């Protein structure tokens, strides 16, 4: 990861009593502190509507570290929160100006007492409909201004908007009070080690990059499959979003950008994001006819009975689509994106299937054509990369067989891989936005996704529910998932 943060700072969590704070943010800060990445002077300040004292938040910190930390010794720590050095809490409804004023007073006090130099990282772990009011109040209180020699940055969780129009409005509202280099739109997939390795694998190895194009690649498949449903936590939100907005608009499209983009001019935030934007700009929005022919949506049996879900809901818990990237490198190559809840197994991967050789030389000894070569990038679990190819079987009889060459992170490296939120928080503290999305990225992703949602709104809804839990999704999706049907001829 990056080097140690040198400058003092205060990390302010909005929604500090919530699930994301307990499961991800607090354990991430603990690990950064225990591994020596944080400076001597820093503080963690939480705020939410829940009434509690500083000491009560410290108890929650200890509990969160013991329950959610993946460090072997986290639970054995006599006082895990001591690694965070200073933890404070300010209760209040930050959609109200008076609560933000009280928070400002508390942060100014911490600045003065601890010498934090006005450096602040705000993390908005709150419901999307609260974001604009909170930002408005922070601006009115002067808390977004950067004094000379100090910095203020704001991290925004997904979803960033609900469609193209709302994303544009939110971006415009933020640009009125923040500079783009203060805005950190988080997608936790970009913090995963296996995702960051994609660019290294592509542009650090001369044997692979020359064949990543329409001449050699037959199709690309990206799958984000989950075995869980709502689990009683997200029903109300999810029922207004669905699989397409929740996963494809961000995680799946970000993976597509990394696997399909051109080499950046340099390995800095703007150069990388410039190339990702070019990929998104090459995704042509779909017409209603194309949506009908090239997408499938599903809903698992039992979804309508989940807490917070409309009993007559037509929200999709599964989405699959086929598209193309209309640029010189990829034109005509089928791109298949798939995501779903309550699937047979949990995994995220990218599969690249290559074209067949021009002539099958082994037709006398084996089935022709043989299975095509393929490259699988495993994002989770068992992070790694596999290359499948054809090999001659040992023996006097000439026969061929598919084999795999495999790289696994756990088998190749002894050191612990940082959790996604550890990496992302550390990069935000350093002011490096390479792993965060830019405003034009967000809007171009929504441009493509909104065309599909608009198409669905004009088509009759499918007969939901249309797939059983612990399956591969609706039967109709087989036309995308069967390689012989999606393969470019």
Model region roles, listed by residue range:
Residues 1-156, 160-489:
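Secretory/organelle targeting and membrane-embedding segments
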């Amino acid at each position: 990861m990056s080097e140690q943060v040198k400058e003092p700072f205060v990390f302010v969590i909005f929604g500090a009593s919530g699930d994301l704070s307990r499961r991800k943010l607090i354990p991430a800060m603990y690990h950064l502190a225990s591994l020596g990445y944080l400076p001597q002077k820093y503080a963690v300040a939480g705020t939410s509507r829940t009434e509690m004292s500083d000491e009560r938040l410290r108890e929650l910190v200890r509990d969160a570290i013991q329950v959610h930390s993946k460090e072997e010794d986290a639970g054995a720590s006599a006082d895990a929160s001591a690694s965070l050095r200073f933890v404070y809490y300010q209760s209040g409804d930050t959609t109200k100006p008076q609560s933000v004023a009280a928070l400002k007073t508390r942060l100014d006090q911490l600045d003065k007492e601890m010498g934090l130099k006005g450096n602040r990282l705000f993390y908005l772990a709150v419901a999307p409909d609260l974001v604009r009011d909170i930002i408005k109040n922070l601006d009115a209180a002067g808390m977004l201004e950067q004094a000379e020699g100090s910095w203020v940055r704001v991290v925004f969780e997904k979803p960033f908007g609900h469609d193209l129009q709302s994303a544009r409005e939110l971006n415009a509202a933020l640009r009125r009070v923040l500079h783009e280099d203060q805005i950190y739109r988080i997608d936790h997939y970009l913090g995963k080690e296996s995702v960051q390795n994609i660019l290294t694998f592509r542009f650090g190895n001369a044997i692979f990059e020359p064949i990543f194009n329409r001449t050699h690649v037959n199709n690309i498949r990206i799958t984000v499959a989950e075995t869980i449903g709502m689990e009683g936590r997200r029903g109300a939100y999810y029922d207004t979003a669905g699989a397409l907005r929740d996963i494809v608009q961000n995680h799946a499209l970000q993976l597509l950008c990394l696997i399909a983009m051109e080499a950046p001019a340099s390995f800095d935030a703007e150069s990388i994001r410039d190339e990702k934007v070019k990929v998104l700009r090459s995704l042509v929005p779909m017409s209603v006819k194309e949506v009908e022919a090239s997408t499938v949506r599903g809903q698992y049996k039992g979804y309508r009975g989940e807490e917070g879900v409309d009993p007559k809901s037509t929200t999709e818990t599964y989405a699959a689509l086929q598209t193309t990237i209309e640029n010189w490198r990829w034109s005509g190559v089928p791109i298949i994106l798939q995501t779903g809840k309550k699937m047979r197994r949990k995994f995220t991967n990218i599969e690249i299937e290559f074209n067949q050789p021009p002539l099958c030389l082994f037709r006398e000894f084996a089935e022709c054509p043989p299975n095509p070569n393929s490259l699988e990038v495993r994002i989770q679990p068992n992070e790694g990369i596999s290359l499948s190819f054809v090999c001659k079987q040992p023996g006097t009889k000439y026969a061929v067989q598919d084999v795999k060459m495999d790289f696994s992170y756990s088998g190749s490296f002894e050191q612990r891989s940082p959790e996604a939120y550890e990496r992302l928080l550390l990069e935000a503290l350093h002011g490096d936005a390479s792993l965060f999305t830019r405003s034009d990225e967000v809007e171009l992703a929504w441009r493509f996704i909104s065309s599909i949602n608009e198409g669905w709104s004009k088509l009759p809804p499918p007969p939901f529910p249309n797939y059983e839990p612990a399956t591969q999704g609706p039967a109709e999706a087989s036309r995308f998932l069967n390689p012989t049907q999606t393969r470019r001829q």
